[in-house]
Amino acid sequence: MSSSALQVAKTGTYLPDLVEVQRASFKWFLEKGLIEELQNFSPISDYTGKLELHFIGEEYRLKRPRHDVEEAKRRDATFASQMYVTCRLINKETGEIKEQEVFIGELPLMTERGTFIINGAERVIVNQIVRSPGVYFKDEQDKNGRRTYNASVIPNRGAWLKFETDKNNLLYVRVDKTRKINAHVLMRAMGLSDNDVVDKLRHPEFYQNSIESANDEGINSEDQALLELYKKLRPGEPPSVSGGQQLLFSRFFDPKRYDLGRVGRYKINKKLRLTVPDDVRTLTHEDVLSTIDYLINLELDIGGASLDDIDHLGNRRVRSVGELLQNQVRVGLNRLERIIKERMTVGETDSLTPAQLVNPKPLVAAIKEFFGSSQLSQFMDQTNPLAELTHKRRISALGPGGLTRERAGFAVRDIHPSHYGRLCPIETPEGPNAGLINSLATHARVNEYGFIETPFWKVNNGKVNKDGDPIYLSADLEDECRVAPGDVATDKDGNILANLIPVRYRQDFEKVPPEQVDYVQLSPVQVISVATSLIPFLEHDDANRALMGSNMQRQAVPLLRPERPLVGTGLESQVARDSGMVPITKVNGTVSYVDANEIVVKGEDGNEHFHYLQKYQRSNQDTCLNQRPIVNIGDQVISGQVLADGSACEGGEIALGQNVLIAYMPWEGYNYEDAILVSERMVTDDLYTSVHIEKYEIEARQTKLGPEEITREIPNISEDSLNNLDEMGIIRIGAFVESGDILVGKVTPKGESDQPPEEKLLRAIFGEKARDVRDNSLRVPKTEKGRVLDVRIYTREQGDELPPGANMVVRVYVAQRRKIQVGDKMAGRHGNKGIISRILPREDMPYLPDGTPVDIVLNPLGVPSRMNVGQVFELLMGWAASNLNCRVKVVPFDEMYGAEKSHQTVQAFLEEASKQPGKAWIYNPEDPGKLLLKDGRTGEPFDQPVAVGYSHFLKLVHLVDDKIHARSTGPYSLVTQQPLGGKAQQGGQRLGEMEVWALEAYGAAYTLQELLTVKSDDMQGRNEALNAIVKGKPIPRPGTPESFKVLMRELQSLGLDIGVYTDEGKEVDLMQDINPRRNTPSRPTYESLGTSEYEED
């Protein structure tokens, strides 16, 4: 094989651990964050100052969790540990000290995979990106078009302070967006004299106006300034000097109320070139004076002063699990503080102990609230390993303290030059969240201040130095360096070859000689996220389609027999490993035992290490989690080696779909508008068959009439229907069930009033009490079927926690195999998606010169306008690889190996493949990449040669079985009486505004009238219509829609005298059918029609 053909994966480095961002943050919380909060919280004094309670934060202790991860999932419990802290109660009067270890609450623990188990469900805490605390200088235009400058001091928590200038060169200050105050009033209130201020400013003449303005207002002393400040901040309250001092202290100088945080202090010191110590977290006089000085320099346009870009990643920081949890603990501890103070006041001083004072409930509630209902605590996307991994690396600008979808403008959502190597410019959702939810780039990491860093190699005098570890730079530091991209061509010693190199410097592009380059990127892949880096030939795809490709890989359903891609990018194995879906050995050793359930590795020290495999477990998205061993007894393994394949993995690599033979050609209109024509081979050979596991649950509750019972004795059910139930009335494992079959038999006690008349008659005649129960069994829903995989029974006797009022809970897991069918959605990795329109017998499919029928026929018109040509490169490279019987790894952005390298490489591979014996036909130099196909139905060749090859195609989670839905009668909305919407509500099909236009265009008047009346909210009309249909009579004239009556009532409630009148001017009583309607159900059913109504008149 020619050397030029084999330019494959040379990423230069392995990626860092992809879940590190989650794990490192939680580790910081356990080691520092929690201790920090407990120390800040301590000591607590009572209102008299006699008692003091100290928390010895560094001595906190975590108990071993009650359940392990698997048991917590099984029992619907939380995987959490109990927290204990040593508390010291000091009585200052007597000098008595009581020390005790106190329980302060349960802390959910992170699993090894970076997730949390909350109430049995696996959840992920998404990282949040927020504006960093610090000082920001901005310019604005006032209404006269004059440019004004302002400075905002933003703390981590506390009041914002904003300085601004006006046209008279006066300086004003606002506290938390209140009214403007002369800046010098604040200076005097803070105890600074005129000379203190003037001495600190480089251009005091600008500030002189503000001093004179304050003097003109008669504010000459500190006391007067405090009174003025109090008046402005608390209008309507009587001002006092002490009140002003208290207000100023609590707003800016009280560490409990105002906190810049470590990051805020770091940013302010850096921006204003100060040397205030890191542990001073409140405002200082120096901060305020330096801010005013900087603002004046901006006004006077003096060098060195620059405006801030709030979208720059140097000014936005990431809050990960640890910090979010720390903030929540702070909330809980503040609630606890109030309780402790109250108890100190109320209780007997002598007999009080720390345990009596500390109530764990507020802290438990705060933590529970965060994990259970915070916007950032999300139900993990477990569709496949990539979805799980991407979810853990997601960065959201939404959430508490962040942006909202409605408020976010274009600037926040846009790609910023500082995103380079930090946030992926491609992977983001389509729709309202575009640009607000991002993904961390492959090599990015979050530093101790929460800023995203990315690695570089140092360049010394034109030579790339790859010895040692790469250097990580944050966006601020990188701006001051000249950075070359990762695909710069170098010789084998690392010397840069070109004479002029494109570099990024201060967010602009320049060309400089190699000697001036400071750093070079680590890898061409470091700009993009993990999902995007799995797309081969990415550089040939339009960004919009690459975005769809990245997002759709996360929706790929794990298949029964996954197959890794013929054309990959070299990152597949690391994605599988870091996702946590594959078991990995932590020791060097030998495999001593393997079966489907466990693998035992005997370490070099002689100890046995057990790895238990997941078997057919249900994921959060109802896909199947199953692990299959890939090692044999006697195999030598090394630490970090994969022992088994998880779902959507093969050979330790991620395998989301199948490599199938694809032809790009139109076929009888069946691939019009992105539809896909597939061969029956995909169905018969189970290429795209997947297993889905549904969970069905039923509770036996305590009712007023007695307990519900789970039993086999169900009234009016034939013995045949009970065949698969055991003696308790629960379905046996392994049974095949279809829609309507009983899974769990349950009877509910029935009151006397529930008896139908015939039952009462039987009672009166025979005097015997028939069993007073109603059938309330759990049945398989419509359109569902499958095989019972597992049954779990939960009772209080076994120690299970059940919902209030429930005596027993039974869960049945049903697995179904879903073959590919018409209506399923499929996609490639380049954003080329479509719906299956027809499944053809393989003998009718177009076939190759050697007789092989193709698997999929796609429309060639889907390529040019979408500009995702990467799919064509993948197709031909896959064609060459399958004929050479090898797999290829192609790193994106391969121009570093020479111009047009992708094109040359694919061509060289095809030529190489055609040199195989008997394979000359696979490559035609006259028409490279195309073959003359024949029609399977006639055997005639098609007119034109067709592009054919192997591509990796995925089956997506949007399956037609989950979407198909029909309704004849069903539930109605209570207010409007219109049918509900959606499959889950058994809703109707909405004909919206545009569909109505279409009917209007055809003049379909009666159809339109039915849509507005009997098919919707004409309550009487729809009951009569159903009656007429059942009896075969003509449908009567429709009545008045309920929504019209609601509208009339709403207008009347506004005090408008509005009514409906006939042509003759007679008022129509819209409510005349109210009384008869009370007796008819709002939901027409066949039972509601009495037997007499069926009889012909």
Curated annotation (Swiss-Prot):
Keyword Transferase in record: yes
CDD domains: RNA_pol_B_RPB2 (cd00653)
Catalysed reaction equations from the record: RNA(n) + a ribonucleoside 5'-triphosphate = RNA(n+1) + diphosphate
GO biological process terms, semicolon-separated: DNA-templated transcription
InterPro entries named among the record's database cross-references: DNA-dir_RNA_pol_bsu_ext_1_sf, DNA-dir_RNA_pol_bsu_external_1, DNA-dir_RNA_pol_su2, DNA-dir_RNAP_su2_dom, DNA-dir_RNAP_su2_hyb_sf, RNA_pol_bsu_bac, RNA_pol_bsu_CS, RNA_pol_bsu_protrusion
Keywords: DNA-directed RNA polymerase, Nucleotidyltransferase, Transcription, Transferase
GO terms assigned for molecular function: DNA binding; DNA-directed RNA polymerase activity; ribonucleoside binding
Transmembrane parts of this sequence: none
Gene Ontology CC, one term: DNA-directed RNA polymerase complex
Compositional bias (Polar residues): 1077-1091
Residue ranges, annotated region (Disordered): 1073-1097
One Pfam assignment: RNA_pol_Rpb2_1
Superkingdom as given in the UniProt entry: Bacteria
Keyword rRNA-binding: no
SUPFAM superfamilies linked: beta and beta-prime subunits of DNA dependent RNA-polymerase (SSF64484)
Catalytic activity, EC: 2.7.7.6
Annotated HAMAP family: RNApol_bact_RpoB (MF_01321)
Subunit structure: In cyanobacteria the RNAP catalytic core is composed of 2 alpha, 1 beta, 1 beta', 1 gamma and 1 omega subunit. When a sigma factor is associated with the core the holoenzyme is formed, which can initiate transcription.
Family per record: Belongs to the RNA polymerase beta chain family.
NCBIfam families, per database record: PRK00405.1 (NF001616), rpoB (TIGR02013)
Record function comment: DNA-dependent RNA polymerase catalyzes the transcription of DNA into RNA using the four ribonucleoside triphosphates as substrates.
Identification of the protein by name: DNA-directed RNA polymerase subunit beta
Gene: rpoB
